[in-house]
């Protein structure tokens, strides 16, 4: 199970209240370089929020060569389960997954990813809450925990840890 119906309702409400997904646009240079080096064509922004990553990539002639798809269960029109892509981007998403669904989501991501990907994960509480009052980051774990968890499904090629976040190239 990728999410519960109750949580999907929380996501829909939250997306109506607030613009989510802005952080990934600032990572477009890093993602571009990694994806280009892997020779990919199709990129999936999994948990795309408002779609700022796709907008950032399409606004730059060098980056616009990629075919970019978006998936977010909380946004009508972006909530269809995606097909396999060469590369999967997951920025500020995994910490929002319901803990009981995380293993299924990681397995799903592994099936969707043909060549590689980029995951950026916050390790601290969010500044926002869900409409039901819970912190928007449902999983708050240190980088070491995430590295172990991701290593169960992916071959991590590079990672970096900063205060409050960790990033992994696959």
Predicted regions and their residues:
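Short "lid" loop at the C-terminus of a central beta-strand within the Rossmann-like core
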Residues: 122-128
